């Protein structure tokens, strides 16, 4: 029994190691990517001199951007209160759902703009909260550009 378990682990561990994704999973939120729709999952891979995006479903290449072509990196957050969900849950659970209104989910966004010769483009992507800082640090590292906080640029009247 121990030999079978040892054999199984010896075969499983190398398979899991090679199956790992060495990039980031992001969600396209709009912009000038060809054939992409809002909400499409993308894989982001940072190379030495380029930024590579491919579609998560099918693995087809979306776009390959030279790091030297990036003109701006921006980032921001979108925060909502869950009032509608809290009201619905409070009606069913006799008020306990009201606690849900106190939570604030955050969505983290990163924007890229580029100009590669006569081709200009840009788009926004939503990052996982665990990968957000890694994506920003990687983009800043290979482009040499400092990311700009888009929330600080917003004018509020």
Protein language model regions, located:
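Short polybasic amphipathic segments
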Residues: 25, 50-54, 110-114
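Bacterial N-terminal signal peptides
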Residues: 8-15
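Anionic N-terminal interaction surfaces
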Residues: 17-50
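Glycine-centered tight beta-turn/hairpin loop motif at sheet-sheet or coil-to-beta transitions
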Residues: 37-39, 56-60, 115-120
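Acidic, Ser/Thr- and proline-rich intrinsically disordered linker/docking segments
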Residues: 20-22, 69-157
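Positively charged n-region of N-terminal signal peptides that target proteins for export
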Residues: 1-6
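Sterically constrained small-residue positions within well-ordered secondary structures
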Residues: 10, 35, 44, 101-103, ...
């Amino acid at each position: 029994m121990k030999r079978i378990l040892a054999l199984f682990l010896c075969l499983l561990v190398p398979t899991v190691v090679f199956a790992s994704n060495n990039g980031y999973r992001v969600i396209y939120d709009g912009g000038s990517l060809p054939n992409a729709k809002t909400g499409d999952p993308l894989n982001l891979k940072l190379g030495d001199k380029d930024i590579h995006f491919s579609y998560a479903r099918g693995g087809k290449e979306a776009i390959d951007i030279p790091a030297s072509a990036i003109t701006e990196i921006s980032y921001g957050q979108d925060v909502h209160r869950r009032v509608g969900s809290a009201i619905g849950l409070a009606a069913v659970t006799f008020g306990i759902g009201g606690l849900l209104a106190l939570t604030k989910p955050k969505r983290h966004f990163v924007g890229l703009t580029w100009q590669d010769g006569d081709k200009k483009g840009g788009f926004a992507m939503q990052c996982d909260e665990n990968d957000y800082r890694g994506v920003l640090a990687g983009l800043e590292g290979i482009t040499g550009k400092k990311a700009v906080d888009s929330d600080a640029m917003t004018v509020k009247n």
